[in-house]
Amino acid sequence: MRINRSELAVPGARQELFEKASNSASDIIFLDLEDSVSLDDKRKARKNVIEAINDIDWKKKTLSVRVNSYDTKFIEEDIKNLLKLTSDRLDLLMFPKVNNSAEVMKLDKLVSEYEISYKRKKKIGFEIIIETTLGLINVEGIAQASKRNEAIHFGAGDFAASIGAKVTSIGGVNDSYGVLQNKKGNIRNYFINDMWHYALFKILVTAHAFGLRAIDCPYGDFSDTKGFMSLAQSSYTMGFDGKMVIHPNQVDLANSIYSPTEEEVEEAQEILLQMKEAEKKGKGAVAFKGKLLDIVSIKQATNIVKMANKIKMEKMK
């Protein structure tokens, strides 16, 4: 599975940003032909992206392109031209606003036909964005619809519009979505809730059930470092693999948060050692720092150590 701690969005109409993106520390770069590009600029942006894929040194980064959505007149031309005119440097196609498994299966068939027609050597992987009500209720079928599927993203902005949410920001919390503490004297604290928790958790569970990466939605206020870090830390703790980022100043933050800390790795290694010793003594559980460790602890600790080793290997390439 690819490392996907940070995934930097780069508008296809903004050629001046391509080189900067290639020099960033983002694990994955996605060049965008969809929401960040006006209708009048769609074809020009596609041409820009094709040239950038072929001409720019993207180093060892994973390179993706977000094409236009399934219900637009642009999507087939996007896919055809990308697979016909780009080198094998292209790794992934990102599909926005996916509503059901049938769409993914048709896209898989289309991509397969073009791969054969244009004699492409590398098999293209898929990233799916869930950002509609239909997409969320059908996410389990969508996740299984193609062997090309690698990651499921949550798109909070369009999802908010699809449910009629009274928000204008992309991702983050909303001060109006909260509850008052039960009345105790004259003091009643107000607690802001996470209005995206259900959608995030459903996507997270589905992604991991079918061996896909779970990627959190972008945080629109790129000037709010603390807000970004708070939500990223929350989704990392839940089990998300990474986060879509919309500004270069969010890349290092995401890479740091979605990587196990030295303390986490050291503790995980110690847990594995303790459990190995317990196994030698015929024990299935052991006390460690005042907590009970058992077989489940081995799985959790192994995940942390594997992720740390994978990041270390990537840095050595």
Label each PLM-derived region with a short phrase.
Residues 1-317:
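Expand to "…catalyze enediolate/carbanion chemistry for C-C bond making/breaking, isomerization
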